[in-house]
């Protein structure tokens, strides 16, 4: 058994209504999505936003031991596929989003929040098929949104199949909001993309890139067909670059859509039901442990994957 430092526990209320606990396990490969406030085009592709986001991503990934596999920065949201090697994903996302928000406020002369008030969508990718599909999904997102005809046409930050595990971004420190005298903010940082560890072992690098390329081609075809059926006109890279950051996306989107916590990929019915059962068991064990903890039993054992209660209150979890 182990327990973590209670830290700021005495300042945190634990009787307020809680969202579902997030399952955080070391070595998990996940897809992260977060939107801008009211879908403003605050991340419109331009050199300054590119530099800010990549620099911050590189610094935070290095600090928290996160492996970056894929990234697409749309004008209204981010997509990341990463592996949480050290079980620090919540810390990583908190720092990344705070720094990106502060920098964006400076660049865009923006008052108020930059990110949507909903917490980040974090989808655990439980199978090799799921990782391949979500890597391709992240790449195809600009096509699905009707912004460009092909993933390779996106003028903002993106990663293509042939760049997986190969590309290294070298980013100079943005001017204006990172203290050059603070060693936390080096003059230059490198962000080297890695291959998802389990897939590199089972597929091999070249076969994995080919599998993602095939899946990307499939998703691009479906996206182009959907854009055509909706009667949309593809905006194009040049018009994307000219979007006002203060303009909002106008395409229909439900206010409260589904927010899945895991993905298994197509044709994985058995794995899906197993994952549902495991998630329900985790949440049930968490609720039962929380009730006992609130009743004063500080020695109660929380289920493996408990993160926030470990961090804030030092609860006991299995080793």
Predicted regions and their residues:
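Short catalytic/metal-binding and nucleic-acid-binding patches
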Residues: 1-319
């Amino acid at each position: 058994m182990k327990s973590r430092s209670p830290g700021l526990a005495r300042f945190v209320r634990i009787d307020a209504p809680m969202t579902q606990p997030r399952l955080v396990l070391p070595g998990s490969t996940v897809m992260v999505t977060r939107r801008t406030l009211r879908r403003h085009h605050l991340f419109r592709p331009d050199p300054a936003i590119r530099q800010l986001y990549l620099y911050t991503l590189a610094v935070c990934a290095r600090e928290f031991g996160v492996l970056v596999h894929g990234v697409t920065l749309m004008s209204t949201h981010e997509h990341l596929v990463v592996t949480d090697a050290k079980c620090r994903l919540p810390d990583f996302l908190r720092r990344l989003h705070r720094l990106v928000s502060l920098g964006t406020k400076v660049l865009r002369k923006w008052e108020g929040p930059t990110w949507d008030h909903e917490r980040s969508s974090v989808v655990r990718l439980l199978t090799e098929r799921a990782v391949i599909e979500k890597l391709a999904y992240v790449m195809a997102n600009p096509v699905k949104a009707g912004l460009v005809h092909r993933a390779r046409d996106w003028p903002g930050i993106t990663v293509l199949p042939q760049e997986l595990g190969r590309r290294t971004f070298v980013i100079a420190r943005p001017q204006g909001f990172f203290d050059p005298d603070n060693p936390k903010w080096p003059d230059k940082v490198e962000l080297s993309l890695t291959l998802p560890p389990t897939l590199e072992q089972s597929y091999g690098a070249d076969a994995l890139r080919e599998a993602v390329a095939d899946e990307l081609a499939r998703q691009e075809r479906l996206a182009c067909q959907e854009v055509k059926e909706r009667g949309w006109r593809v905006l194009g890279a040049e018009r994307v670059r000219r979007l006002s950051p203060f303009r909002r996306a106008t395409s229909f989107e439900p206010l409260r859509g589904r927010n899945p916590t895991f993905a298994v990929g197509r044709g994985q019915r058995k794995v899906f039901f197993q994952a549902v059962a495991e998630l329900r068991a985790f949440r049930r064990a968490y609720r039962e442990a929380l009730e006992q903890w609130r009743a004063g039993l500080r020695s109660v054992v929380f289920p493996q994957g408990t993160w926030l209660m470990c961090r804030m209150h030092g609860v006991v979890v299995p080793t």
